[in-house]
């Protein structure tokens, strides 16, 4: 559809025929379709936060756009506190809003959003608001989310202090702290070298092989064995939620810990 201007319509006394009526009305329909397409691509997300492990506070937004049956609708949302029930342990959940009979209902599901992160995959009645994860006891990880970026109130441990970390790139999954649709993870890296010589601890996005990129990994210097180094960094993630890590030198007394502090779409 095209956004054509100006619109010329029949005036009093003008002949009304296919040429004078169809053309301006087709242009008007085209403009309406353009505006509708733009509305569908406008993702208005509310702020989300959970601090007590059971409730999610959802902020207000000027409109939620989704279908009710086969009809597209837009409705303002004043915000609310939602308490999801029946949460399983160590599971990703997705929060949705649904327009029904003039009001908005909130629900959660293990069904992920579509590739546009706009509605539930395969069901446009459910508008995607964000995601959350439970720990090993079914408690919601405390988090704050806005504009597609989520930060945890406490870091999610992915790799505890491990002895003798590898000196070659080794896979580690971020699935415990990063949802499948995420593009970036915010990491807290803690390193402790074996010897008294400073060395590098490294993380990298798996699969980056482009020629001319040197170094491929993000490298952070950790000092002598009496001093641990801690660093915060963003890193790109692939759809498998897997990155790689290693030490330059390593050794039996070396330590490496990796925590997720947040993620971004």
Predicted regions and their residues:
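Glycine-rich, low-complexity segments
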Residues: 30, 34-57, 111-169
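Short, flexible beta-strand-to-coil junctions
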Residues: 30-31, 96-112, 133-135, 187-197, ...
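Glycine-rich, compositionally biased intrinsically disordered regions
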Residues: 37-113, 197-198
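Beta-rich globular "head" domains
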Residues: 62-64, 87-99, 144-218, 257-265
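Acidic, glycine/polar-enriched metal-coordinating patches/loops
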Residues: 73, 77-85, 101-141, 210-227
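Noncatalytic modules at the cell exterior or secretory-pathway interfaces
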Residues: 125-139, 185, 234-252
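Beta-sandwich interaction modules
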Residues: 223-239
